[in-house]
Amino acid sequence: FGHLFRLAPIGLELARRGCQVVYAIPDVARGAALLQTHAYRILHAPVWQAPPKEHSLSQTYSKNLLRNGYWHRESLRNQLQGWLALFDDAQPDVILAEHAPSALLAARKAGLPRVAMGTGFSLPPLTAPMPGLQPWFTLPERYLIKSEKEFLECVNPVLRDLGASALTAVADVFEGAIQLLCTLLELDHYGARTDTRYWGPVIYTPQDSEAVWPSDKRDNIFVYIRPEHRFFRQIISLLKEMGLPSVTFAPGLSHEEQRALEGENLSISLHPVNLKEAATRCRLMISQGGHNAGALMLLAG
């Protein structure tokens, strides 16, 4: 939800100013449900179909892209061709890409104006080579250079086949794009940057999704963890056993499991919770790391 929620208020404001806003998202049904109050055109974004492959820990931005499909040239070609076809259909004047490097590469090939927005994770420092994803690890420069080379050897042949210019560095994914680093300095994945403007997080939350809060006081606990998380059930069981008033947002949980897990002191929502309300009703949030929710709660104290 975080990626779409970063785009939603911007799309709303652009539409208010008379722009025609077109969304391209992988899950059209879910996107339409989340954007149901707004009259947007929603297109199906290209979906990665790279075959499964074991990868080592993603220690750089390029390694993360490779493990998510960029290693497979045919899938990457299909991705870029899909975006180019989508641009031909939508005829955009500008592309606003939120953690969408393939869309940026396709827009680069098509010569379309583009804006790259995101958190520190999705907008890395544009150095050559790029730094490691885990600042607490010290990676040899030769490893960083090797990661860049591996990425370029996978991507550049595909770009050339499509008639696009090759990249000289991984940072060229963002070449020509206006960059909007939408986070706080304290939450930047790569640590504080002195040469970049921090625009702050995009705070957006559904206003019409009311949760059932067990306590009328501000002593509830808000949990935002997906059911597939390995500690999900242990956390729910512990909260129930301790009798702590809690609300859990568990996207993807079945109705049967919801009924089985709920208790007198614990309610579970299958739909996004109004986080601004949650910030006034809870004293603690347990989350698996969502940037939007974490930033909102921290700013609320």
Model-found features: residue ranges?
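Active-site-proximal region of nucleotide-activated glycan assembly enzymes
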Residues: P113-Y190, T194-T196
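Conserved nucleotide-sugar donor-binding subdomain of glycosyltransferases
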Residues: L57-S102, Y143-V170
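Conserved nucleotide-sugar phosphate-binding/catalytic loop shared by glycosyltransferases and other
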Residues: R16-R17, V21-H72
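A donor-sugar binding/catalytic signature common to diverse glycosyltransferases
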Residues: D93-H99, P124, P272-G301
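Short, polar loop motifs at secondary-structure junctions
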Residues: I25-G31, H99-S102, L184-D188, F249-E257
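Donor-nucleotide binding loops and adjacent catalytic segments primarily
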Residues: G11, G191-C282
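Conserved nucleotide-sugar donor-interacting segment of glycosyltransferase catalytic cores
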Residues: R77-R142
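A short, glycine/small-residue-rich beta-strand->loop->alpha-helix junction that serves as a flexible
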Residues: F1-A8, E228
